Amino acid sequence: MDILSLGWAALMASFTFSLSLVVWGRNGF
């Protein structure tokens, strides 16, 4: 696995996680 693709995967994962966290916060969990 390339280090660049690994970094992109981590970035997308953290972005999706934070996005879902914001959505949950707006819905009152």
Curated annotation (Swiss-Prot):
It holds the Pfam family PetN. Belongs to the PetN family. The lineage of its organism: Eukaryota, Glaucocystophyceae, Cyanophoraceae, Cyanophora. It is a single-pass membrane protein. The chain crosses the membrane at residues 3-23. This is Cytochrome b6-f complex subunit 8. It comes from Cyanophora paradoxa. The keyword Glycoprotein does not apply. Component of the cytochrome b6-f complex, which mediates electron transfer between photosystem II (PSII) and photosystem I (PSI), cyclic electron flow around PSI, and state transitions. Keywords: Cyanelle, Electron transport, Membrane, Photosynthesis, Plastid, Thylakoid, Transmembrane, Transmembrane helix, Transport. Its main location: plastid. GO terms for cellular component: cyanelle thylakoid membrane; cytochrome b6f complex. It is found in: Plastid, Cyanelle thylakoid membrane.
